[in-house]
């Protein structure tokens, strides 16, 4: 699980460990990853922390060699920042694609080459890929990740490796808590459910895709967004 030391990633690590998996928590923050891994280990869960810069392809492939074979890959790590449409730069686009798409593609390629037939890959996209204001580089990178999900699902289906994506909406993470009260209220007003989701909601969806009961589902996007994708203006 990449980006596994906080937020949705941490909830996913704990959920998969409770499902019986031995989980590699991959994160760039050594102190945080080691602290959270120790906390989960104290609960009797099989979790190991691994520090990795996902933009370092050689390091990515070295870690995959160390961990292989991997039964389930969760590409959760990503970056988000706001840029107005008329000021977003080519550097902003490159950085978003480097982390939100290319890192996931590199890891998927490396893992799938050694993954047992019947493995599972889950990509964490975003409801924003449908279109949203004030972060066009992020929207584009997540839309690209959805496209890559479908392409890799077709490539890997003959081996029984299933690839799906989850598109979270408003989830209670540090990014959401950083919003001003007015901005948060405006966002929640657009939610049919009137509330934000929890990281555990995403972890539950990952657990579903990682399970043996999903043997005929691949190339799909599951929206976990409190109904936001049903309509309304993007934010």
Language-model segments: which ranges?
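A conserved structural motif in NAD(P)-dependent oxidoreductases
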Residues: 191-202, 213
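Short C-terminal tail/terminal secondary-structure segment
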Residues: 207, 218-235
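Active-site helix of classical SDR
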Residues: 108, 141, 149
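Canonical Rossmann dinucleotide-binding motif of NAD(H)/NADP(H)-dependent dehydrogenases/reductases
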Residues: 1-24
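Substrate-binding pocket helix/loop in short-chain dehydrogenase/reductase
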Residues: 84-85, 92-94, 187
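Alpha-helical segment proximal to the catalytic Tyr-Lys
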Residues: 113, 154-158, 215
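Active-site loop-to-helix junction immediately N-terminal to the catalytic Tyr of the SDR YXXXK motif
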Residues: 88, 127, 132-140, 151, ...
């Amino acid at each position: 699980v990449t980006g596994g030391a906080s937020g949705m990633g941490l909830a996913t690590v704990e959920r998969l460990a409770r499902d019986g998996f031995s989980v590699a928590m991959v994160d760039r923050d050594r102190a945080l990853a080691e602290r959270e891994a120790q906390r989960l280990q104290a609960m009797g869960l099989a979790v190991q922390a691994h520090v990795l810069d996902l933009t370092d392809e050689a390091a990515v492939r070295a870690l995959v060699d160390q961990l292989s074979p991997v039964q389930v890959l969760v590409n959760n790590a990503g970056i988000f920042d706001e840029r107005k449409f008329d000021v977003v730069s080519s550097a902003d686009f490159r950085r978003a694609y480097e982390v939100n798409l290319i890192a996931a593609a590199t890891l998927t390629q490396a893992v799938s080459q050694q993954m047992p037939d019947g493995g599972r890959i889950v990509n964490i996209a975003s409801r924003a890929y449908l279109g949203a204001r004030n972060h066009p580089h992020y929207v584009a990178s997540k839309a690209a990740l959805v496209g890559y999900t479908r392409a890799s699902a077709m490539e890997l289906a003959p081996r029984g490796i299933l690839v799906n994506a989850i598109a979270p909406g408003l989830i209670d993470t540090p990014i959401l808590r950083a919003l001003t009260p007015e901005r948060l209220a405006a966002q929640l007003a657009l939610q049919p459910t009137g509330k934000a989701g929890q990281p555990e909601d995403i972890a539950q969806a990952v657990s579903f895709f990682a399970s043996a009961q999903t043997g005929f589902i691949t190339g799909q996007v599951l929206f976990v967004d409190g109904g936001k994708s049903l309509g309304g203006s993007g934010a």
